[in-house]
Amino acid sequence: MKAMKILVASMLAACSTWAAAQQPIVIKFSHVVANDTPKGLAAEYFKKKAEDYTKGRVKVEVYANSTLYKDKEEMEALQLGAVQMLAPSLAKFGPLGVKEFEMFDLPYIFDNYDQLHKITQGPIGQSILAKLEPKGIRGLGYWDNGFKSFSANTPIKQPSDLKGKKMRIQSSKVLEAQMRALGSLPQVLPFSEVYQALQTGVVDGTENPISNLYTQKMFEVQKHLAMTEHGYLGYAVIVNKKFWDGLPPDVREQLDKAMNESTAFANRIAKHQNDQDLEKVKKSGKTAVYNLTPAEREAFKKALLPVHKEMASRIGPDLLQQVNAELAAPSKKK
């Protein structure tokens, strides 16, 4: 009888182990923007690729629009293991103590996507991601959103037009310095609160890629948009390091493959999405869109480029020297 009980117990244990082994590995992927933004679309693309390549061994649950965690909460949630994957904007990593990421916030550091990708897809970008590991975070890649432009309820044609205005920014010393250089009053607000703050006059204006301005309906409460394209907004896709290191090697390999393809997808659609959303903003009739003349663009550059020197000691002069040297070097033929 005793032998029978042991046999039954062992069979039940075996069944339990088998059932546990069949449970998929769940990745909770939280972000703060809409599903139809470049990041939102790329997150869904990653979900499909990850689940396909792992043949269902991994299940990705995407939580968009701050439905799981808000701006200020998500990084801590990742470090504690409450969520496994995020794609925060690059400005979020300076307050975390990795100030090298603030290089991406510098105004007019990149003239175009080709220059940007020389950094994000090269050794400099990878070395910056590696600095997250002591924080318990592994960086998997960079996703584009786009180049930011200023919006407000009064016309913006020259730097002085922003003087005295309360401008919403992300928490970033570089962005604070940028706004002060224009005579603006920087106001740090979570992304999910920006629409209401613009609507109620808590802030006068903001800076965003067009996809954010459109999908979050900020254009409904901003009468003017100037295509300054003065700064870049992108994301680092990150994962809890302990979780990542605990995955079977073949699963990591499949997820890396899914991430590489998702990164190519994200960066391919980002500009297209922003161009499409710009046309939608124009057609809405709610926001007047102004294209700067070359002289006006130079005036903004002249006002903002001193921020590079001001922030050099914070970001790291050696890093800035490496970035500038890489940007000045001829591009390698593919």
Which residues are covered by each model-predicted region?
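Bacterial N-terminal signal peptides that target proteins for export
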Residues: M1-V8
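N-terminal signal peptide c-region/cleavage motif recognized by signal peptidases
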Residues: A14-S16
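Juxtamembrane cytosolic interface motif at the C-terminal end of transmembrane helices
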Residues: W18-A20
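N-terminal secretory/targeting leader peptides
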Residues: Q22-Q115, P123-Q126, A130-K334
